[in-house]
Amino acid sequence: KDIQVSGHAIECRIYAEDPLNDFAPNPGKITGYRSPGGPGVRLDSGVYMNYTIPTFYDSMISKLVTWGRTRDDSIARMKRALSEYIILGVKTTIPFHKAILRNPNFISGDLNTHFIDQYKNGIESEMVNVIAEDLENVNKMKSTFMPSKKIAAISAAVGSYLNTAKNQQMNKK
């Protein structure tokens, strides 16, 4: 009979577009990719590492949806999901969504159909901050996962140890 509200959902459409350049399409090859997940997170996408965003079609990469019992829960999940979402090689609308989710008027639900135009300057300056933070985080991740001689030596030693132990077990039988 009556429709009952049972939580809140937010959808962010992720496009290969440059939000600081009037959302101009940004086709190209995805050189790094990690999708978000977890409770209350849904991702509808067809892209993957080394996928090429074509110039001839819609530049949509994915639809990222979060659900929570409250608006605040849904916003928190979307912030987390966007922070986990890594797409390298093309510019995306992820910084735009992160900037919107930091806007106090969005958080409080003080919205109207002119929201983006009303807060354009603040959103753009926040996107610049987001992009700088994301770049710093990507550089940290790169240095964390760079192969090192110590790691290679330890990996080789562990592999050798496991093979020796396996062979000794086989010889006992």
Predicted feature descriptions by range:
Residues 1-173:
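Catalytic cores of soluble metabolic enzymes centered on carboxylation/carboxyl-transfer
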